[in-house]
Amino acid sequence: MEMDDSYIYVCGTSAESKKEIQVEELNILSYDTPAKPELVSRFHIIGQHVGESFAEGNRTNPNGSDQMITCHEIQKDNDRLYIAYRDEGVVILDITDPTKPVRVDGGYDYSPPFNGDPGLPREGCCPGAHTFMPAHHAGPLPSIAVLTDEHFNCPPGFGRIIDITYPRHMTLLSTYHITGVDDQYDFDKKKFVCPEGSQESAHMAEFDHRVKNGNLFYQAWYNQGLRAIEITNPFRPREVGYYISPDFGINVPGQKGRHTREPYPDWDSDLIYVTDGNGGGLTVLRYTGVLPTRPPIPGVR
């Protein structure tokens, strides 16, 4: 969900939605009268409504499972919405007039060739794109965005850096992963090997808006904690800090290990509030700078 002084932007179903699958769409509500919010417009992907058919590329994954085409995470930047739309990939909408949202991107849909989650269909989580976060920018529109997956199969979801200078022709610049999770490939068995007993995936990202050129962001990574990623060179993302919380061992049903989910930076206090979805509550952090390349040696200059 996102909101401004007059409107709320939220994913949800409608009377026209297909009932047998998860098909949330964008709903824009005016709350000029807070006691009586009013739906002013909607946006959906063709195929989400009863009587419609999905485009061929939005039907099945390479493993034969059904894709999930559903609105999930919304980011507002001036007069545009940047939406992670699960197996549809990403959507950019111009909301200069919120009652008439207009799609202005040419699509960036990577399922197929990737599965949203190779483990689906099953109970649990999750297909495809989770967060589509534009970087801080000096001009009227952003040129770089972070796109994260969310799925727990092996290999798990990871992150992408996207050039969105020309939204109708978005370009993948690089990907980023977590050492020890995404890089463990068994060449003899021809498959990835992932940690047991935990859920390993990227989740929500949030840029550090104190960095004026938008080159530092905080990436929640479930069992791998909070990671600070620097993209001064967007072709080569670099991890420059991390915080891995204790394993609280509470084990909410359906969850495994740490569940570092969302970072919420407060730029006035210079603090980052981080949530844990497996009973770990709220952790308050402060980013103090880049990790040293090696421990300092006393007395050496």
Task: Indicate residue ranges for each PLM-predicted region.
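Feature marking well-ordered beta-strand scaffolds used for ligand recognition
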Residues: 1-301
